[in-house]
């Protein structure tokens, strides 16, 4: 089973992924937790290039670098894990590329879909949890954690985070467009709800999606 988590930066994906991983471990469910970009030696090196603020990368270059890390991760880690019936939890997948590079950066969506299909070997998540939060709220949340001023665009954050409110509004709207076209695999969550409440909703959704995870009823 492939589970993906999506949302703009500051939505709380990492918190929910950690909670889910803990429950799966306690229930004795074999699982693997990964992140994009990253997950392999090559992908982690590319991640540092993508996220370091001193590097300026074109929209197309950014897309191709993300796609390179994804191809490595899917072929080397995700597919082998799924073949052993492990649950794979992924912090971002190709929906992030659609939202960020497509709707955010303005890259042609038709070209984007071709590259996505090629780099993922047409792998589709079984369920995608989208944690929704307004960019303004996400920025306040992230800056409060980093003890930085609220002038988000001017803060010394990584290159992508410095894109600002307008960019993140485009990304959020892009996610809504994606969800409308593939409602069957998305579970939309209000990221401002208490983390424990969100966790319960995630477990309930997984139990319905995969009866084999009935062991999660105890948690």
From Swiss-Prot:
Does the keyword Transferase feature in the UniProt annotation? yes
* Signal sequence range: none
CDD domains reported in the protein's UniProt record: TMPK
Listed A to Z, the keywords are:
ATP-binding, Kinase, Nucleotide biosynthesis, Nucleotide-binding, Transferase
Q: Offer a single GO CC term for the protein.
A: cytosol
- A Pfam family name for this chain? Thymidylate_kin
Reactions catalysed: dTMP + ATP = dTDP + ADP
First-level EC class? transferase
The EC code for this enzyme is 2.7.4.9
Function of the protein: Phosphorylation of dTMP to form dTDP in both de novo and salvage pathways of dTTP synthesis.
- Listed name of the protein: Thymidylate kinase
The species is: Chlorobium phaeobacteroides (strain DSM 266 / SMG 266 / 2430)
* Lineage summary: Bacteria, Pseudomonadati, Chlorobiota, Chlorobiia, Chlorobiales
């Amino acid at each position: 089973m492939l589970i993906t988590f999506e949302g703009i930066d500051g939505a709380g994906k990492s918190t929910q992924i950690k909670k889910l991983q803990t429950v799966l471990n306690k229930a004795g469910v074999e699982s693997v937790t990964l992140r994009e970009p990253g997950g392999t030696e090559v992908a982690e090196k590319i991640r540092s290039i993508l996220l370091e603020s001193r590097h300026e990368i074109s929209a197309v270059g950014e897309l191709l670098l993300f796609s390179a890390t994804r191809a490595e991760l899917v072929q080397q880690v995700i597919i082998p894990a799924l073949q052993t019936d492990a649950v794979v939890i992924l912090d971002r997948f190709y929906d992030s590329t659609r939202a960020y590079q497509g709707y955010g950066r303005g890259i042609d969506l038709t070209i984007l879909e071709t590259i996505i299909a090629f780099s993922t070997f047409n792998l589709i998540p079984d369920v995608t949890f989208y944690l929704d939060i307004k960019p303004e709220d996400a920025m306040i949340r992230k800056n409060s954690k980093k003890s930085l001023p609220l002038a988000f665009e001017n803060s010394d954050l990584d290159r992508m985070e410095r894109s600002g409110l307008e960019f993140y509004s485009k990304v959020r709207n892009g996610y809504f467009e994606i969800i409308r076209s593939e409602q069957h695999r998305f579970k939309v969550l209000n990221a401002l709800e208490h983390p424990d409440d969100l966790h319960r909703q995630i477990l309930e959704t997984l139990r319905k999606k995969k009866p084999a995870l009935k062991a999660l009823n105890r948690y």
